[in-house]
Amino acid sequence: MKRAYAVSQYGKCYEQYCKEYLPQQAKEIFDKAEQYYKEFVKNDMPDLGENLMAKNMLDWFTILSFYEASDHKLDGEVLLNIKRKAADKMRFLGKFVNGNKSRWPCKMFEKTYVNFNKMKKEHQDKGEWMDTWDVKINPDHRTEGFNFYLIGCPIAKHAREHGYDKLLPYLCKTDHYLAEVMHARLIRTQTEALGGDHCDYWYVGDESPALAEYKDLEQI
């Protein structure tokens, strides 16, 4: 049976974790998570449209569903464990993508967000996608890597309004993991989850001289 939360990349990961570490409770957790997920989507889904950015909200609802279904056993530390394992399985990408040498991933990300901004404007002119993120491309005028801001995060808004503000920073922290697989690093100084007015992203190669300036920066 394909469950509703299977649309999220986290669904299968959480199921595998439960089967390994909570085998006696796994089936019950899956059933409860399914119901929680449906309720979150029905009652709490903002007007984000159908796009890659909107899938981030479905990931968040999946994480919350397993968190609640397990009586909070599947907490933030478990989320980091799950995401780290998923990233480790993708280490083969490092053979093909090197953040110190490859420019195409940055160009691809930039094109993706340029297209998103274009679609967002078209939809918002019609009164749609009104709750989605604002994306500012290279607001810090970086000449290296890829820099952008996400502003008005609907996930952070949901977390604050529903008492999940302690859980969300763990999800934000997982942004670092896939970058490391591709010999890159994420330099981030603030997130909305931790009270910032935006989430900043600056991806550079893991051999970048820029990292020296931020060597004491906590991964958030």
Regions found by a protein language model. Give the residues of each.
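Short, well-structured alpha-helical interface segments that form or flank functional binding sites
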Residues: F61, S65, T174, G196
